[in-house]
Amino acid sequence: YRYPIEPLQEQLRRYLGTLTMGDLWQAEPATDLVTTTFDLLDNRTRFVKPWKAEYAPWPVVQAVLASCAVPTYFPVIAGRYVDGGVGSYANPCYLAAYEARFCLGWDPQETTIISLGTGRLPRTLQPGMAERFWTWDWLMPVLGAFEQSAADQQVHLVDTFFDQLDFRRFQVDLREPIQMDDVGQLDRLAAYGVELGHMILDDQLDRAMGITALRAPQPE
């Protein structure tokens, strides 16, 4: 891996201290925080919640670390947990809608879900380029396809099956690829943040919310 986990862990402890997931649920008012992490040993996504007995003792620091331990960037947490985005929930809007409706029992007509994207990757491939790919050239396009398809799928699921929710998804189009650890791009990322902020103020929704079902013609 590229980076040790200790500096991030120390900063999280500085702000979160010894707070546990269970403490969030016992607070007044109770707070539901759902973090996802992929369990390599069980080969499944785990949903770490403060009201689940098995996760109540977890320090919030551990839940955050387990949720953001990107493979090859950070070490595996507790020998089994990596970034929750490894599964289908890099965009957790469907998870949030499900939690609110079926776990917390909230009235969907009284519930607003705001989903903020981290940037839609630009289209950089030109016709014929893929025909000249070496084996390793396929890695990023395939990973990008999985990630973007899963993210758009979550939006479509919420928009289709939770239609009574006030659901709003905002996403900004990146004009160039930016590596997640490229600190030299912080100013550019901040500019994208301002752009996303204007989209929120203008209620300019992600185009993934425009996906609609095309009805098949009736057979004659």
Task: Describe the role of every protein-language-model region.
Residues 1-220:
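Patatin-like phospholipase
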